[in-house]
Amino acid sequence: MSRPVPNPGILDIAPYTPGKSPVAEPGRKVFKLSANETPFGPSPHAIAAYKSAADHLEDYPEGTSRVLREAIGRAYGLDPDRIICGAGSDEILNLLAHTYLGPDDEAISTTHGFLVYPIATLANGARNVVAEEKDLTCNVDAILAKVSPKTKIVWLANPNNPTGTYIPFDEVKRLRAGLPGHVVLVLDAAYADYVSRNDYEIGIELVATTDNTVMTHTFSKIHGLAALRIGWMFGPANIVDAVNRIRGPFNVSVPAQLAAVAAIQDSAHVEKSRTHTEQWRNRLTEELTKIGLTVTPSVCNFVLMHFPTTKGKTAAEADAFLTKRGLVLRALGNYNLPHALRMTIGTDEANELVIEGLREFMAQP
């Protein structure tokens, strides 16, 4: 008997595995530090705006997220007509793949890049080409060496998840200059709000001056609206026009749009999160290094720690040890980092408990 056959590439996809949900010993307080969520939650203004939509849930959203696009435009100094909003930046990444990739095409991602990139690539029948990183950081020369006539997209998370590393804007510009004009460079800036380095740029300048570069961003991280799934893209008019032709007309709900508008206007809430993150990023790096772990320098709201391969000291054993204590970190075997754990920077209490827990774990005979 015949049965439906998925399109080429679909069955080659390894399903995405999100961060673990909290499970601990009975009676223990649980801290989820596996999904890079903010410990401060959304702005109170965003919560109030979200609730204000409750009396009109029978109404469809405005189809282009116009008010939200205008708010983003004001915040970043951008033309709203060159912005697309989506149900998380994941939707926009998939729309870009659907717009520009097909069978026999190729897209390039890096060794430890965001797992949605190969998923979006394979889902459209294209081939995912992996460029090696250097010191857990994107290597522009390695990416350029992988370019072929079949290359249609280069995916670049800057800064990158799960490594927390970034490349300076001069390197991003060098990458764009080295790519053929028909290749779309996708700059995923999900964690840009946490970066304070002088040589970093979110990508707006490059998008504004080329017709083959886009920048995506999200409200899930520093704005604390992950549950509402809101992302956006800034791109050249030609790409925005093409993507809008396949974007669903009501893809961002009214409550989500209202909450996002309020969130982007609350700069004090964002600054509080940014300050907390930077202080704890430095402290965690220092304390975990003292314990005997190797910590990859991070510019994000998480740290990547590397464990020995010695029995009793491994990442898997540390993960189990912490989980029993209600501290849920992210194992990274599916990112080709089996000897590492990623820790979201959480509340003061959660961060202190992780330090104490890992100190106890590493001190075991």
Swiss-Prot record:
Pfam families: Aminotran_1_2 (PF00155). Belongs to the class-II pyridoxal-phosphate-dependent aminotransferase family. Histidinol-phosphate aminotransferase subfamily. Its cofactor is pyridoxal 5'-phosphate. Residues 1-22 are annotated as: Disordered. InterPro entries: Aminotransferase_I/II_large (IPR004839), HisP_aminotrans (IPR005861), HistidinolP_aminotransfase (IPR050106), PyrdxlP-dep_Trfase (IPR015424), PyrdxlP-dep_Trfase_major (IPR015421), PyrdxlP-dep_Trfase_small (IPR015422). Keywords: Amino-acid biosynthesis, Aminotransferase, Histidine biosynthesis, Pyridoxal phosphate, Transferase. Its EC number is 2.6.1.9. Pathway: Amino-acid biosynthesis; L-histidine biosynthesis; L-histidine from 5-phospho-alpha-D-ribose 1-diphosphate: step 7/9. The modification N6-(pyridoxal phosphate)lysine is found at residue 221. GO terms for biological process: L-histidine biosynthetic process. This is Histidinol-phosphate aminotransferase. GO terms for molecular function: histidinol-phosphate transaminase activity; pyridoxal phosphate binding. It catalyses: L-histidinol phosphate + 2-oxoglutarate = 3-(imidazol-4-yl)-2-oxopropyl phosphate + L-glutamate. HAMAP family: HisC_aminotrans_2. Homodimer.
